[in-house]
Amino acid sequence: MGIMLDETDKAILRDLQEDASISNLNLSKKIGLSPSACLARTKNLVEAGIIKKFTTIVDEKKLGIEVTALALINLSPLNRETIHSFLEDINKFPQVQECYTLTGSHDYMLKIVAKDMESYRNFIIDSLMQNPAISGVDTSIVMSTEKRTVSVPIDEM
């Protein structure tokens, strides 16, 4: 069960998810609080761990990153030691943007970005597959991104 939020907290979260660079003054005006009350509520949301961080979304294509891949990973043997080793390794690689533990026929799914297909291939062979616990990598290349959001649906809470 999640933390109970009132409508003001939800409004703060909605607005910050839309634009994390909004000033506290503008945010307070938008939601109808004094700046000090708005700042206190925002700090409470951070301290409660509801707001994990404030960040910027970058257009990777404009930086020359042309490949986004979803790699399904299998580990063998699948035990605490291999899982720990795998997670330590992938956290070292900036190309790995996301990692999910799965149920079903694959153990993990990674979202990996690379400059081009050659860079992706080199990353898989020279970096990722150096972990002996990885027994298989099944890759799908993203052709286009139709929806991308990091926002949580606040109104569904």
Curated annotation (Swiss-Prot):
It comes from the Bacteria. Keywords: DNA-binding, Repressor, Transcription, Transcription regulation. GO terms for biological process: response to amino acid. The keyword Transcription applies. Residues 24-43 bind DNA. Residues 5-66 form the HTH asnC-type domain. This is Transcriptional regulator AzlB. The lineage of its organism: Bacteria, Bacillati, Bacillota, Bacilli, Bacillales. The gene is azlB.
